[in-house]
Amino acid sequence: MAGLLLAMMFTISNLTPAYAHQPINLTATNSSADKGPIIVDGKVSFVIRANFSKPNQTQGFRAALQAGETLYFEYLIIDKAPENKLAKNKLPVATITDPAGKKMVIKFTERTKFYYPFLDTNFVYLARYNQTALDGIYKFTLQSKVKAAIQVVVGTLETYGEVLSPATCPAWVKPSGEVKILPAYAEGLVGMKKEAAASCAEKLGWQYRIGQEDNQMFALTRDYRLDRIND
């Protein structure tokens, strides 16, 4: 009987998900999507927390998806004051910009309460959205109307996911076989000084092309050939 009980306990414990949403805490330094962290695989589930101390503050992040994958987004608040007392037009505005540059403002379509046991916390869903993704980097911008704290979720895959710091040379290990530089890694160089980004690309063994340049800001295209550098 003891052996059977232990077996039952083991089975039940294995039914519990191995991962909850992985957290990302945005700060004032993440004042735009281009200055925010980059989720390498947008299918992986992350909860992104934004805390605003006054109106008209902006925080943002990015996530990479491949064509045909699903962009999944949730907007939540903790079920307590002041957030659960705010009118919809006083809550932070969430805007998603797709790789083609099309912007979409998330509309609040529900007010569904639920209990999240991992944090022993009650939340309220205000929006849940999904669509078939384009290939490239999605940018998420959150802008406050008043002092408020919110959480948004991207992705549904409950497994470990990688997050890159903005404008930072990534810790990239060259894989065996044909090398494909993921868009998220190239995106990580956006915002770096030209010389620093070129040095990073050289250190990692990348070939690159500057697609545009604005003072010290520029973006990389998918053409990484060294003989295709434009000034």
Give, region by region, the residue ranges found by the protein language model.
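A residue-level signal for beta-strand positions that form part of recognition/binding surfaces
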Residues: 17, 137, 228
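Short, charged, low-hydrophobicity "junction" segments
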Residues: 41-52, 82, 178-186
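Acidic, Ser/Thr/Pro-rich low-complexity intrinsically disordered segments
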Residues: 52-124, 131-135, 145
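Low-complexity, flexible helical/coil segments
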Residues: 108-112, 173-180
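C-terminal edge strands of extracellular/lumenal beta-sandwich accessory domains
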Residues: 22-32, 61, 90-101, 129-177, ...
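Exposed, flexible binding/inhibitory loops of compact, secreted disulfide-stabilized domains
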Residues: 177-230
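N-terminal pre-first-transmembrane soluble regions of secretory-pathway and organelle membrane proteins
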Residues: 1-69
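Soluble periplasmic/extracytoplasmic beta-strand elements of cell-envelope proteins
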Residues: 72-74, 93-95, 141, 153, ...
